[in-house]
Regions:
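Conserved acidic donor-binding segment of nucleotide-sugar-dependent glycosyltransferases
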Residues: 107-108, 112-118, 127-132
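A structural motif in glycosyltransferase catalytic domains
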Residues: 8-12, 28, 120, 159
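Short hydrophobic beta-strand element within catalytic cores of glycosyltransferases
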Residues: 92-95
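A conserved mid-protein helix/loop that constitutes part of the nucleotide-sugar donor-binding site
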Residues: 1-16, 37
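Short, structured helix-loop element that forms part of the nucleotide-activated donor/catalytic region
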Residues: 17-19, 27-50, 54
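Aromatic "clamp/platform" in nucleotide-sugar-dependent glycosyltransferases that forms part
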Residues: 56, 75
Length: 164
């Protein structure tokens, strides 16, 4: 529940009810691990064949290269490494407006932030409606953020600074 998966499924279902999106072939792929009982309870709620639970995603390269938008609905995270990974693969990201994700994503610049389900729906719509130039600019900005703040060299410099 803390991961926000139920919220994401609800929002996805609402998106498909909207006239301008109900004809699109939109698939929701949910990666990550959870208890078997939790996954079973989610599966009971789902009537849509376009929602897939992938479990642990071992081949991140293939996964991130197969998606257009990465949605990180978690209510709390330590760092949100998977968000950084998605950004580094050049995937447009949408994440909950909580710390530390809101220090990684600058809303509307290198991704989108949302506070509640209504905003998540709005941000998904906005992301789907971006033209290729707008999307490319956001992805480029995200890659620059990763390089500037989260590259191996930046991590090394931060650790070195902390100890010296």
């Amino acid at each position: 529940k803390n991961k926000g998966i139920e919220d994401l499924i609800d929002v996805y279902s609402n998106l498909l009810k909207k006239e301008n999106f109900n004809k699109l072939e939109l698939n929701l792929l949910i990666g990550g691990v959870g208890s078997e009982n939790y996954i079973k309870s989610l599966n009971k709620k789902i009537s849509n064949k376009n929602i897939q639970f992938l479990g642990y995603v071992e081949d991140r390269f293939s996964f991130f290269n197969s998606i257009e938008i990465f949605i990180f609905p978690s209510y709390s995270e330590g760092l949100g490494l998977v968000l950084l990974e998605a950004m580094s693969y050049g995937v447009l990201c949408i994440t909950r407006d909580v710390t530390p994700m809101n220090s990684i994503i600058n809303n509307g610049e290198n991704g989108f932030l949302f506070k509640d389900n209504n905003e998540l729906l709005e941000k998904i719509e906005k992301a789907l409606e971006l033209n290729s130039s707008e999307k490319d600019n956001m992805v480029k900005s995200a890659l620059e953020k990763i390089e500037k703040s989260y590259s191996i060299m930046q991590m090394y410099l931060s650790i070195d600074k902390a100890y010296n």
